[in-house]
C-alpha cells in the first residue's frame, strides 16, 4: 500500500518519504501513458504529495511544470488528505533513452520553462509562485523551487521505474530539509548518506515497500516518526460537477449540443467519461419556474 511518512530529528533535519507505486500505476492505466510520460507524471505526483503537507499545516497543492518538451504541461493536484491526481498534455511521447537505458524525462519535459506551484491553505491567502526549470527531471526543479521561492534548502530524490510492458514497477521519493537549527555535522552526515544511497528507484527495486530507506538517509541522527498515512490516486470530478458546468453554457452552445443524441464529457485529470442523453440535457436546460 502506498504511503507518506514524515520524520523529525534532534539535529535539525526533517524528512518526508513517500512510496507511490500503485498511485502512479493507476495514473498510467487511466491515461494510457507511455513510459517516459509515466516517469514524468509519476515523479511530479510524488513530489506534489511530498509538498502538500508540511510538518504543521496540511494543504492542497497545484503543480504545473511547463516545459518546452514534447510532453507539454505536466498537471498535478495533491490534496491534504494525501490523494493526488494528474495528467500530461501528450501521454504518447517517446524520446531516445539516456545512457544505460534510462528514460530521458528531462528531454520529454523540456529544459526550458517554469515550475508553478499554487498552495491552497486554510491559514492564509492562497498564493502562487514560479521558478525556472533547471533540468526537466522534476526532482532538481522542485528543489530549486523550494530554495528560490520558499527559501528552504532541500534535497529531493524522485524515481519511477517502468518495465518493458509499460507497467510501473516501483515509484517513490523523499525530501530532506534543513531547519534553521540544523548542525553542520548533521548536514554533512545526511549528504554522505544520500550520496551512498544512489537513485531511489534502485533502492525501491530491492525494497518495494521502502522499508529501511529512512534509516539509510538519516543514519547517524536521532529520528522521531511524526506522520504515517496512506496515499492514493483520487479525482474530485463527478457527474454533478459536469452537469453544473453544462448549465453555465451560453444558450447558443446549449442548442448546439442538443443536436447530438448523446454528449460525452471527459475529465482531464482522471480520464473518466460522463455521458448525458439529449433527454437529460433538455430537462436540465428547461427553465424551471419558482416553487409554489
Task: Tell what function each PLM region has.
Residues 195-292:
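Cys/His-clustered metal-coordination modules, chiefly Zn-binding fingers
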